[in-house]
C-alpha cells in the first residue's frame, strides 16, 4: 500500500500542506478567535448586566447562531449576500463568520463564568467606593476569565479544525490544498490522513499551551489567595 512513490508523494506534499496551515489556517484562527472574544465579552456583559432590550437581542443572536450550522452561515455570507449587493472576499468572509459563530458559544461560556463570581465580591467593591464599571473591570471580569479559560481554550482548538470548512468558500487553507493535490495524484486516503495529522499536531500544540496557561493561572490564583 505505502510504496516508494506514495512515500515520495507524502514527503513532497507535506510542505505544500504545512505552508497553507501556517499562512492561512493559523492566522484565520488567531484573527477570528480574537474578534470572537471581543464579541463574546460584550454579549456576556450585556446579559450579565440585564440590560433590557439589549439582553433580548443578545439572546436572539446566540439562539440563531447556535441553532444553525456553521457551513450554512458561511454559505449565507459568501454566496448569499452578493445577491443583495454585499460582496465579501473569501478570507474576510471566513473571518466574519468564524468570529460571529464562535462569539455566540464563547458568550455563553463567559456569561456562566461571570455568574459564578460570588455576589459578595461585588458588594465588597461597592463598600470601598468603586463604581459598577470599576467592579466589573477590576474584580468580576478577571475572575470570570480565569474560570472560563479552559473552555475558551477548547473553543480555540475547535476553531482550528473548523477552519477546514473555509475551503468551501475558496479559502486556500490546508484542506483545499489537500484536495488540489488529490486531484492530481488520486491518493485521497493517504493525503487526507496526512492533513489530518497536521491538524492533530496543531491541536496538540494548543492543548499543551492550554495546560501551561491553566497551571500559570492556578499558580497566580494561589498567590493572590
Language-model region placement:
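Transmembrane alpha-helices and adjacent helix-loop boundaries
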Residues: 1-225
